[in-house]
Amino acid sequence: MKQRIWKIGLLMFLSGFFVNRTFAQECKELLGEKEGKYYFQNGTIITAKDRQTAIVTYNDIKKGNEYFSNGYKNFVEGNYKSAIEWYNKALKLGNTDASCNLGYCYEHGLGVEKDKYKAFECYMRSAQVGDAIAQFNVARMFEYDKKYEEAVEFYEKAAKQGHMTSQRKLGNYYFYSRGVRRNYTTAVQWYEKAAKQGDKEAQIDIAECYYDGAGVAQNYLEAVKWYVKAANQGSSDAQYQLGYMYSEGLGVTRDYTESIRWYRKAADNGDADAIFCLANKYYNGQGVTQDYDKALELYHKAADKGVYQAMYVISECYTYGRGVKKDLNQANYWKQKAKELENKNK
């Protein structure tokens, strides 16, 4: 209830004079007042001395909103200096949305010189009156400075208001024990909230939790469900994982054709491991007609992306003349290159 009042920012209730009688009654009950003669300013409930004061205050917030809208319009059009002027005017009338947007301008040097301290100050001003985006930005800046306990405090504030990215970040904090004690169950709960809002990374995170049995009982079918959601949003990681799960029959019936379909999607998105696995399918004839030429082409693409396993297979192709003319010099070259990269990655 209090949060709802806070988000309104400034409203006036005077014995039902207010535009929304239901909300006015809620405020009356919340405060335990009988007469209900008060107005709200910047999230603080103040007893109204007279009706005129309340009306003047209401006009200020209305004007502040207009100034903010002008600022935002100029910002979108790229007129950053004008935007800042309007934001400052709005801020003087208590518009905290303007403060958050000013923070963005200071952080990125739009219309003003970059100043992360002023940016933080502006974000914090909005965060303290419940602005979820500002809370996220405050948390992000704390995180950048490795102040994880402070970061988790503000991620949680934003997450509880439904801020999607903050929910995922909070899940990460619990999963990896950043600023809080590790708790996989709590991590999964936050991942799921973000995932249900469509956060692609959170969908992968919760899929991995089900895959590994971290915070939940291991459930490959549930993992597949979440990987599919992320894959359909273009995640090459999820597409690769689906290719693997269909290839191995994890949570689904083994299906090499379906495996290839997902590997190909991931490969088209540049996923090096997917390119290598797709090459293996052509090399072994799993789900496709065996084709050494196509396999070798894909192995070279994977090798160019640093997959040393692909280099070993290229060496094998030159050793036995598969998809290429037999050439022991080339075979040795690729084998040595693979060894060097493998040792470097250890």
Predicted segments with their positions:
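Short aromatic-glycine-(Arg/Gly/Cys) micro-motifs in beta-strand/loop hairpins
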Residues: 27-43, 58
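A short, charged, amphipathic alpha-helix used as a generic interaction element across diverse proteins
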Residues: 48-61
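Hydrophobic face of amphipathic alpha-helices that form TPR/SEL1-like repeat modules
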Residues: 66-76, 100-108, 136-145, 169-176, ...
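Short helix-capping/linker turns of helical repeat alpha-solenoids
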Residues: 60-62, 74, 92-96, 108-110, ...
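Sec/Tat signal peptide C-region and signal peptidase I cleavage site
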Residues: 19-24
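TPR/TPR-like (Sel1-like) alpha-helical repeat modules
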Residues: 126, 312, 316-319, 325-343
